[in-house]
């Protein structure tokens, strides 16, 4: 009986790790897909990403409530069904609606398939929000909590970074160079892979027994949220996480756009490769952090990476485009490599900000986690704002927005993360 339960848990752990990877896979489709839609509609490059992350604003708290009401297993199953529907809608946009004009924007006719794609991106956003709510606590629980639970989360996080690296790379290979003939059908293999993994994961989770924790009374959730927001360092941390997700997504997305828009043969593939290198840098950063986190404080790590990120961004902004090097047979501005290197810095920011922001919250930590999940919407809003700036100026100038956000995170690390509300009872 014990052996059967152990085998069941192993299958569930492997499945959760793959789902952890799929969260990043689905999320990071936004930039390469944005290249396709942005070529046809110059205003739409970041809209899919915006819809994907806007879902967090509406689904963050409901996901937590759903988790308490129906448990891990049923929430995960529901999320996978939602994900399949979202990916199917995105595929539908490649075969239907291109010849059906719905309205005009700035004198440009807008076809129905764009709206179908955006709906699919929103639905996928609901999916990844629900999965994010499930995967971390489920892996921790399956590991028995403590160090073993954290180890499983780190394994899942590594796979998450790996798929974040591969997604823009695969999309770039499939597309090559974005032209007027490029469409969503060119990247349909990615959508089919996603749907297949979700379907297989659904079947596995359905038949695997997963222990459900006792969540207790959830009626005081809103009161807990109000209590959590009494802490200044949490409020400042919530703003920091909002900016962080915008930074994490915005840097590689606009790096991809910048290189792709150079328009040479294979520019989309090279743009995807450079964006993938950013995510690979994040993978290296997360792996390296596991060895130093026990010796160096979170505040010190955050201060260092924020400062280095500012230096890399300023170097990328001020370095002339004429300073270039050959990369895969083409002259590429050196500044793009400074942008890709920022992945080393952003790799530890999510965990670092969360750790500093919830320090000393006690019973309010769970409510704070729900608030944090809502603020992931920054990954849609801030890259969209960066895209607006890029359209009115240029791609590199838009990185001043990222500089401002990183500067705020440096402020939070040095000053804003200090708990000045120790008089509030948390037990």
Which residues fall in each region the model found?
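Central cavity-lining transmembrane alpha-helices of secondary-active solute carriers
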Residues: 47-68, 276-288, 378-381
């Amino acid at each position: 009986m014990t052996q059967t339960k152990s085998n069941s848990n192993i299958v569930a752990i492997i499945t959760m790790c793959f789902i952890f990877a799929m969260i990043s896979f689905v999320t990071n489709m936004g930039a390469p897909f944005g290249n396709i839609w942005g070529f046809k509609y110059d205003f739409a490059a970041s809209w899919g990403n915006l819809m994907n992350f806007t879902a967090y604003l509406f689904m963050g708290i409901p996901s937590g409530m759903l988790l308490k009401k129906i448990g891990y297993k049923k929430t995960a199953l529901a999320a996978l069904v939602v994900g399949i529907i979202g990916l199917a809608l995105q595929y539908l946009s490649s075969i239907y609606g291109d010849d059906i004009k719905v309205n005009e924007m700035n004198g440009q006719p807008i076809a129905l398939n764009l709206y179908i794609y955006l709906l699919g991106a929103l639905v996928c956003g609901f999916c990844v929000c629900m999965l994010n709510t499930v995967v971390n606590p489920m892996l921790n629980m399956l590991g028995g909590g403590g160090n073993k639970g954290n180890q499983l989360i780190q394994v899942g996080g590594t796979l998450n970074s790996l798929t974040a690296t591969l997604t823009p790379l695969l999309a770039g290979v499939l597309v090559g160079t974005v032209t007027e003939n490029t469409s969503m059908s060119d990247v349909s293999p990615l959508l089919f892979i996603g749907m297949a993994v979700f379907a297989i994961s659904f079947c596995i989770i359905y038949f695997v027994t997963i222990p459900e924790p006792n969540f207790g009374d959830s009626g005081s959730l809103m009161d807990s949220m109000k209590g959590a927001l009494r802490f200044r360092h949490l409020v400042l941390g919530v703003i920091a996480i909002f900016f962080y997700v915008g930074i994490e997504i915005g840097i590689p997305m606009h790096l991809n756009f910048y290189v792709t828009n150079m328009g040479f043969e294979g520019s989309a593939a090279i743009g995807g490769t450079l964006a993938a290198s950013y995510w690979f840098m994040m993978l290296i950063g997360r792996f390296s952090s596991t060895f130093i986190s026990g010796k160096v404080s979170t505040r010190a790590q955050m201060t260092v990476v924020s400062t280095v990120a500012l230096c890399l961004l300023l170097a990328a902004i001020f370095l002339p485009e004429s300073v270039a090097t050959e990369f895969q047979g083409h002259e590429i501005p050196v500044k793009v490599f400074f942008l890709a290197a920022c992945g080393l810095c952003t790799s530890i920011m999510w965990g670092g900000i969360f750790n500093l922001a919830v320090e000393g919250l006690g019973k309010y930590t769970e409510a704070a986690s729900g608030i944090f999940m809502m603020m992931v919407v920054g990954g849609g809003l801030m890259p969209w704002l960066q895209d607006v700036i890029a359209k009115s100026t240029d791609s590199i100038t838009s990185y001043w927005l990222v500089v401002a956000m990183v500067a705020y995170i440096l402020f939070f690390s040095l000053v804003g993360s200090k708990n000045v509300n120790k008089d509030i009872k948390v037990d």
